């Protein structure tokens, strides 16, 4: 079930007697969806994915939910440690093997702005595309973390030891405060290798919000006088560039639209 709105605005803010014009087009859309039901025999239907990160359809859920593993945490709400990460006795992070919803690929809204300037046969236009909301799993970031080449593995040019704000389970089954120090390498090895080939999925879920300069184009249209001695009635020459500049992204240089192993562009 889909519900949404789409708004479009076309305007010409500037038009001069010399022939200069500025045309502006703004397109805004917002959509929400809900899966009403699946066949009774199916509770989870895979739409794509790889290893321990999958795109599942579930009754009552949204189309395009990202499912994967998450950090193991204290789930007992009556515990004073509720919500804290559970580590090994050596202080290493651990992950739950059961997949849960860790993200949703669907954006909250989309916005496109096209601006076109024209003067005496010349026209210059650019398109800015914006996507707000939604998440994406980045296998690229996970691979860089595993090899130690990601910026997150060497904050401010240093790899200091760390003690996670977490608890571990002692021999009596009770939670104890973690005081064990681990190296940066040990931390990322645990995060990227636990629970499957893609590691703890939650660790590499990023906001898919992005703003980009989608297109730049420059064109020249020959007027009829120039073509009067030719068999052509109209000629327009131009150059165009796509995906020119990622203005804003949360994915450390990875394009949120670059997708592998999912049939839903998640």
Model-assigned labels for residue ranges:
Residues 1-5, 12-105, 136, 143-146, ...:
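Conserved small-residue
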Residues 2-6, 21, 108-112, 210-217, ...:
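Transmembrane beta-barrel architecture of outer-membrane proteins
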Residues 7-11, 113-119, 126, 216-222, ...:
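Residues on the lipid-exposed face of transmembrane beta-strands in outer-membrane beta-barrel proteins
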Residues 9-17, 22-24, 32, 119-121, ...:
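Outer-membrane beta-barrel proteins
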Residues 86-97, 186-202, 259-265:
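Flexible, solvent-exposed coil segments and beta strand-coil junctions
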Residues 104-139:
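Glycine-rich, aromatic-lined ligand/substrate-binding cores of catalytic
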Residues 133-236, 241:
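Extracytoplasmic gating/loop element in the C-terminal half of outer-membrane beta-barrel translocons
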Residues 246, 250-266:
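Predominantly the C-terminal beta-signal and adjacent terminal strand-loop region
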């Amino acid at each position: 079930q889909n519900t949404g709105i789409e708004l479009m605005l076309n305007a010409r803010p500037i038009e001069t007697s010399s022939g200069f014009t500025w045309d502006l087009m703004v397109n805004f859309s917002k959509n929400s969806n809900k899966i009403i039901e699946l066949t009774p025999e199916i509770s989870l239907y895979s739409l794509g994915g790889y290893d321990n990160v999958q795109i599942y359809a579930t009754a009552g859920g949204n189309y395009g939910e990202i499912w994967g593993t998450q950090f193991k945490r204290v789930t007992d709400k009556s515990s004073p440690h509720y919500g804290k990460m559970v580590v090994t006795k050596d202080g290493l992070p651990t992950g739950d093997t059961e997949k849960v919803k860790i993200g949703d690929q669907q954006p909250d809204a989309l916005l496109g702005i096209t601006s076109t300037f024209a003067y005496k046969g010349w026209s210059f236009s650019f398109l800015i595309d914006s996507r707000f909301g939604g998440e994406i799993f980045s296998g690229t970031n996970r691979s860089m973390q595993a090899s130690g080449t990601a910026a997150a593995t060497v904050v401010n040019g240093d790899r200091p030891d760390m003690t996670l704000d977490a608890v571990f389970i002692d021999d009596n089954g009770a939670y104890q405060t973690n005081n064990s120090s681990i190296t940066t390498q040990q931390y990322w090895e645990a995060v990227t290798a636990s629970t499957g080939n893609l590691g703890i999925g939650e660790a590499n879920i990023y906001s898919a919000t992005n703003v980009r300069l989608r297109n730049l184009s420059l064109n020249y249209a020959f007027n009829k006088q120039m073509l009067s001695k030719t068999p052509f009635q109209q000629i327009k020459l131009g150059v165009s560039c796509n995906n020119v500049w990622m203005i804003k992204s949360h994915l450390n240089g990875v394009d949120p639209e670059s997708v592998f192993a999912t049939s839903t562009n998640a």
